[in-house]
Amino acid sequence: MLNSLDLEGRPEDTRVVVAMSGGVDSSVTAALLKSEGYDVVGITLQLYDHGAATHRKGACCAGQDIHDARNVAERLGIPHYVLDYEDRFRESVIDNFAASYASGETPVPCIECNRAIKFGDLLKTARELGASVLATGHYVASRRLADGSRALVCAADADRDQSYFLFATTREQLDYLRFPLGDMTKPEVRELARRFGLEVADKHDSQDICFVPTGRYTDIIGKLRPNAMEPGEIVDLNGRVLGAHQGIANYTIGQRKGLGIAAGAPLYVVKLDVATRRVVVGPREALRTHRITLREVNWIGDGVLDAAVRDGLELFVRVRSTRPPQPAWLRGADGQYEVELVAGEEGVSPGQACVFYDAASGRARVLGGGFIQSAVAESRTTAGLVRPQRVAEPVRG
């Protein structure tokens, strides 16, 4: 007989470590499992210097969050530990974040945090504490497959779905992870928090990059990678100088605002040339992309990746967390993979994730994904000709 976590044994004989951030989602996760009789242990990770962000609304994992997590644990009567992961977080997430921007990319630090810290180090700690599973408050779900392994699927609340940020989760990690909120909506979670008497029931959701207390990510980049803030030229597709900039890290592919140049028609950032410190701008059609190459591809679909894509695999991909999945083809082998976007996409930026799904909507299964290495955009001239050019791949010096 399986319990509610798809495990053998009674809840009271099952230890569960809950990653408690101090927010309403992880707090309700802990409360739900405690109410079902599980042996719950809460762990909060101190990831960075919380001084500047302690009482700022909208900051994830700030000092106030540790206080809130501790209060929730006390109310629930569960053990709670705060682990200092500042050095590890700085090395794995913050340094990589700055290096990625300095290379002309637009990184997604939450993905690396989940991959290296939460589902890497914290999962290992949970095992050492004798836990059968690690539970989190992510809006995503997992389902048992016929062979006993688990699949990652989108959350019931499409507006809160976090599957994009979890594509790098491995099969082994999925077997050990549980997501109790995957079938709930945010309003339902807040209502449960009220029923459990949790003070965080109406707490604001985190909105910013947790380690950027001012909201200005360039402050971090300028400190760790000052070369990314060196001035340079803004040029058009033909190399004509249109203006100057104060650092490539201030720009991302597809950006229109803040260019500081006058033009007869709207211009967008279409390329960041790190070697020459040039920001290349062009018309909107220059952003159109049909083909992207990937690196660090993770596969959690059926079978072996190379066998699945040998003849091309038809699926759906999301190239940005705020955009819906769209039809695509995945091809490649031996670590070299390419995605063909059937309808095309605008503003695809290196460093972002390209996540694979088996459906365009609903409770789609996540098949994996990779980080965008480069994109080939199509610039349509006034004569109606299409000129393919690699405009979104950062040039590293």
Curated annotation (Swiss-Prot):
Catalytic center residues: C113 (nucleophile), C210 (cysteine persulfide intermediate)
An annotated GO cellular component: cytoplasm
Span list, region Interaction with tRNA: 160-162
UniProt-recorded Gene Ontology molecular function terms: ATP binding; tRNA binding; tRNA-uridine 2-sulfurtransferase activity
Compartment list: Cytoplasm
InterPro entries xref list: MnmA-like, MnmA-like_C, MnmA-like_central, MnmA-like_central_sf, Rossmann-like_a/b/a_fold
Disulfide bonds: C113-C210
Site feature location: Interaction with tRNA: H138, Q352
First-level EC class: transferase
Catalytic activity from the UniProt record: S-sulfanyl-L-cysteinyl-[protein] + uridine(34) in tRNA + AH2 + ATP = 2-thiouridine(34) in tRNA + L-cysteinyl-[protein] + A + AMP + diphosphate + H(+)
Physiological role: Catalyzes the 2-thiolation of uridine at the wobble position (U34) of tRNA, leading to the formation of s(2)U34.
Protein's UniProt name: tRNA-specific 2-thiouridylase MnmA
Gene: mnmA
